[in-house]
Amino acid sequence: MSKPFHCIYAHGFIRAAVCVPFVRVADPAYNVERTLGLARRASERQAAIALFPELGLSAYSNEDLFHQDALLDASEAAVVQLIESSRELYPLLLVGAPVRFEGKLFNCALTLYQGQLLGITPKSYLPNYREFYEKRQFTAGRLAVGRELTYAGQRVPFGTDLVYQARNIPDFALHTEICEDLWTPVPPSTYAALAGATVLANLSASNITIGKAEYRRDLCAAQSGRCIAAYLYSAAGPGESTTDLAWDGQALIYENNELLAESQRFAADEQIITADIDLERLAQDRMRLTSFNDAVGEHREQLRQFRRVEFDFRIPSDARTLLRRVERFPFVPNDPAKRDERCFEAYHIQVHGLAKRLQSTGIHKLVIGVSGGLDSTQALIVAARTMDNLGLPRQNILAYTLPGYATSAVTLNNAHGLMRALGVSAREIDIRPSCLQMFRDLDHPFARGEPVYDVTFENVQAGERTSHLFRLANHHNALVLGTGDLSELALGWSTYGVGDHMSHYNVNASVPKTLIQRLLRWIIASRQFDAQCSDILQSILDTEISPELVPSQAGTAQDKPTQSTQEVIGPYALQDFNLYYVTRHGFRPSKVAFLSHHAWGDKSRGDWPDSLPSDKHTEYDLATIKRWLGVFLFRFFQISQFKRSCVPNAPKVGSGGSLSPRGDWRAPSDAAATVWLEELRRGVPD
């Protein structure tokens, strides 16, 4: 059965809601109505989960009133009412209530779903220090003897070992813990995550003191990252007693260390926050992280004790708008501070890698071909900074611009200007005479004056450039510095062997085109070099990306590039997006297209990098996205892996940015792209 493409639940997402109700202390009848109101709002938003605070049906701050049977009876009656009134709602409701069992009182998280109480989880760790005296009223969950009880008229499992599993969404597995449980060295949710739980929910009260909100964020972020899980957190808010404490109602949703949503603190009334959690991303990361699964094996006897409580989740079919920021440029953060930090790190990783290679070889000179394009510009800048750091003169960089039959005036001028501005040893070698000799040797029609611009015509030029560079390196005892980037490597957009595919060392192989563009803008903005150099860099950024191998017309002067790389292989912005989600997360093509359409379908939606000119803001419809994704899948999986199977050494720069067979990507050179192309055809509407 085909899945509804535009529904978030068809692509491994679930929507989570975290609610902070207004409560009355010791008034469960009032509190259940407020809880129901928020639960209905969560259902209207097509949420799969609605989390509420610790002891939210009774209020947390009852202290010794918890030993009053009238309050405990009223709390159980409120649970009965909530069960009956929530039969038609979409989300699982995670609510807090005091529960009597075996002559003890437990602080519990109750999981309700469409008229059924699925299970009850008691709090494992009771704080009994400073302002907390929970052991005065409650018993720790581990002290319960039985594993089932009858509560609110239903026989249900009881314990800290419950994982709620949706039968029809394999990656949707939920565990609950309560407040202090997260503050311990080994929270119960750690074991639950190892047992397969992907969504960890914390019903918390947690009074507020100065600095505590940031500490909560740190705890939730770290636990979600360590467990490779979503972590939902709801602290008590307005209405709790302020006899000795205050409450800020902090609600948080994290996914693998990333904050997805946070409430307004100290709000006067109730709140609800929502975010969409990517369960498939969590499952992919766990599958890849061998140490996570080693930990599962280490604790397997304990993990086997967990009980699965299965349920059939009713999927909301109207959840079409993704409530999640999907950055257009996944390799380049929108946040200026993070973006600048990433550029700083990428730049210095490149410099550090090249410096080490020069030191280890004892070679103090570099040979580089400078085209006036983005990649060779970035490599030349890295080389210049490397020489500075090593205390070597920039004249040790032997930079050559090698014009051919389609070199434009603008790129040639930029190449010469950049070499002058950086103070490197610069020289121009016209490769046309040697290319013509090659055409004659090949008996190519171009040697007879015929305008035949085929792949041989292009690759003879690329090969001649690289051949010159390697022989120049031999002649001057230097290393050839490679310039090809990650995007080109993914798409196979390089001339194999004696071509731009090969070098002695490559500083760009782990840097995608969109990040190189941002790196150059950062170099300009941070004034890494002088104003003259920055002006040339800006001119290079403004120039059309082109291989410059095919002339426009014989005998016609070329002021600007006439070939457009992106007209052949697709916009680099889209292809870098595809590259990131295919290689970093292993997503199926239909999901990549869904995310791409969310990111690129409307240029007025979402944020753009502040340094990107407004005329560069663009949008793509689903048909265009599908077309170029098909190009990417075919080129990446079927026709270009042989080039990646033998690439020069290069430093890994980003977490999703290496295609080296010695690093992140090991794949056969003779695979077929059929399964990806077929999934794209079936899964994405035309």
Locations of the language-model features?
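Enzyme catalytic cores with a strong preference for nitrogen-chemistry domains
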Residues: 1-369, 381, 385-394, 426
